[in-house]
């Protein structure tokens, strides 16, 4: 899904936020490999790099020599550019506060921009593990609970089925969301209800032309064996999308 989204915006500047350093590196390699045909380049950016390596990547991105930076959420806040046209969260953000700041990296020049978040329900458990920590770095106490509560708010935001994500996000911080966008694009929920933004129906297919001829003999079929459910109970889900 990230590849298709970035492909449709080839030549534009973007940020992809990833959960871990390994995710950021894998995402950058995948985008560069799959988007060679449109000339899109990507590179990872995280705390595991040396200061010189990060400086080189940031300079290339600032100068337009690099299209996409795949950054960890924890370290990607330091990168900034006015003409970022899109921000993608390849996984669930840790909080609405963090998402608001990260998504705000797009469109700082005042031009239209887009934000996309891909998530699965099981991402909540993964982020909870990161927040709780491991071994000697395992966290406890009220600060951990506060972070877990913020994660719950983020999950509820992603699970919205109606309403407006923009109004929900702005209202979370006690601000007036202002008037609606009318017939213009807003969030995925509003756009789905907006007739002006619905794609036109596909053109009807021409009727099939049947050629007359002698009947084709059909081979005799053996009785079909009993069908066995090879998949079983699968927990896999298609990534859900949230755009605000």
Residue ranges of model-derived segments:
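Accessible peptide chain termini
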Residues: 1, 243-244
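Helicase motor core with emphasis on the C-terminal RecA-like subdomain
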Residues: 1-139, 178-179
